Amino acid sequence: DERHKYAIMDPNLVPKYAVLDPKLTVSMPKFVTATTGIDALTHAVESYVTWAYNNNASNRNAEEAVVKIFRNLKRAYEDGNDLEAREAMLIASYKAGLAFNHTGVGYVHAIAHAMGGIYNTAHGLANAVIMPIVLEDYGTAVHPQLAHLAEITGVKTTGSDAEKANAFIAAIRQMNREMGLPT
């Protein structure tokens, strides 16, 4: 048993339509809500900080996704019947998908895929643990992007790019803690 996890991509796999019905998500367990929400956040953040292939459209989709996730993930986690939060999370996930479909993802997903293949770690859980570490490791290269995300989410609107970037990473860790995910 080789224990590999592979991504498959083909234009024939792209649906023509997507139905985003929040009622279909209300029965999701809290753990699944938390980890799939963090996976969507990872898609958006990785798309936003990548230098390869990003453009105004992918950045706009990533920004919209990050803002919606910061505003709604904890609400959806705490009250699975909150259809407004659930709908916002569906739209955020969709927008994050549009963003990373154009740009790709980065080291967080590379590591998370390996962990899933080797250790059967839930993908979103691996992302939750790894994302803050990888974002810190990227250092100053991503401070401007993370600073902007801190500003638009209201995490931190004053200070240097480094201070805002670090506050954004800390906010991700706090979100994880509040949903019972390891940090």
For the regions a language model picked out, list residue spans one by one:
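Charged/polar positions within long, soluble alpha-helices
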Residues: 74, 98-101, 105, 136, ...
